[in-house]
Design a protein with these regions (language model features):
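Metal-dependent nuclease catalytic regions and adjoining charged, substrate-binding loops involved
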Residues: 5, 167, 179-314
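Nuclease catalytic cores
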Residues: 10-53, 91, 116, 280-286
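Active-site-adjacent bridging/hinge elements
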Residues: 16-22, 147-155, 254-257
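Hydrophobic/aromatic-lined pockets within catalytic cores
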Residues: 26, 48-55, 102, 123, ...
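Conserved aromatic-histidine-acidic binding/catalytic patches
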Residues: 31-35, 39, 82, 125-126, ...
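Regular secondary-structure segments
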Residues: 44-55, 252, 256, 260
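A non-catalytic, helix-rich entry segment at domain boundaries
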Residues: 46-118, 122
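Non-catalytic protein-protein interaction segments used by genome-maintenance enzymes to assemble
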Residues: 114-175, 179-181
Length: 314
């Protein structure tokens, strides 16, 4: 049975051994559900129906089924930080996105059979390590050049935020997707399109009669201008792809060593915490657990079982 790793697995190994053992060895995640992940997952499901040829109504019904009940129970629409994840905000944004950007208007053609494609591709000649993931759309074909690309949907609080676009310049996920697609299909895959959808709070929902300083009219009349969607092309040189593979195999070996060295919860106090040195503790899901001293007897209270397949997408 080969060792299977996703991009998120390798990224976690690169950041912190403790987070790696917790997430992938002991299969634990932070208690509670992340609104960003919950909304992002629902948007992905909505787009899957849309890109596979479903109607706008069918796509929005999927969004409602996956997100409405949870959002209404967990999100305060007036909350300064979480309000953008309210059901009404997500519903309005996605309803407009589907109306404004039909699949037929994209600069490439989409094969419905190549939407939401799971893959497991051997990283090594022996086949003992496989890279796994889910491509939101594989082998889309540019209408003008006839070249092939992949597509990855991304939701974010701010497309124009200083950190959003730069994360893809050297990021491993798109390089890994590109390498995997080139291994899977006979056609030459040129790059990956990031379909970025901004899930920021629409000002219209807070005060529809307030006048917009940018458009000179009430927010209720210009709210659609505040929906931000961008299609961003990511490309890599041949050397960058080769270097990625070398690094991916090295991190996979380190991952294997961690699982073998620290197989039980009782080993947690001995696992290295590199995050203290590289800053990854700041946004880590396990920060509270580690700050409390990694209490093994509190593991079941401070964390919860993790759904493995959710890792494939990131």
């Amino acid at each position: 049975m080969p060792l299977q790793v996703s991009n998120n697995t390798l990224a976690t190994v690169a950041k912190c051994s403790t987070a790696t053992v917790l997430r992938y060895g002991l299969m634990r995640q932070a208690a509670g559900e992340s609104a960003a992940l919950k909304a992002g997952s629902a948007v992905h499901s909505c787009l899957e129906v849309w890109w596979k040829g479903g109607t706008r109504k069918e796509a929005l019904v999927t969004l409602r089924r996956e997100y409405k009940e949870w959002a209404e129970a967990n999100i305060d629409p007036d909350d300064k930080y979480q309000g953008r994840f309210s059901w009404e905000n997500i519903r309005k944004i996605m309803g407009f996105v589907l109306a404004r950007y039909p699949v037929s208007a994209l600069p490439f053609t989409v094969d419905p059979n190549m939407v939401e494609v799971s893959f497991a591709v051997p990283l090594t000649k022996s086949g003992d390590i496989e890279i796994i993931g889910i491509m939101d759309a594989a082998n889309v074909r540019d209408k003008r050049t006839k070249r092939f690309y992949g597509v990855d949907h991304k939701t974010t609080g701010g497309i124009n935020a200083p950190w959003f676009l730069p994360q893809f310049r050297m990021g491993s996920q798109m390089t890994g997707y590109l390498w995997a697609m080139r291994e899977m299909v006979p056609e030459k895959v040129i790059g990956i399109y990031v379909n970025a959808i901004q899930l920021s709070k629409l000002p219209y929902l807070a005060n529809p009669e307030r006048k917009c300083k940018d458009h000179g009219m009430n927010y209720e009349d210009c709210w659609v201008e505040h929906v931000n969607v961008q299609l961003i092309l990511i490309e890599r040189t041949e050397q960058q792809v080769k270097d990625w593979k070398i690094d991916a195999i090295d991190l996979s070996r380190r991952f294997m060593d961690l699982l073998e060295t620290y197989p039980k919860a009782e080993h947690l106090p001995k696992v290295p915490q590199e995050g203290k040195f590289n800053g990854s503790c700041t946004m880590c899901d396990y920060q509270e657990f580690c700050f409390a001293g990694r209490p093994v007897d509190r593991l079941g209270v401070m964390t919860q079982p993790r759904e493995e397949r959710a890792e494939w997408r990131v």
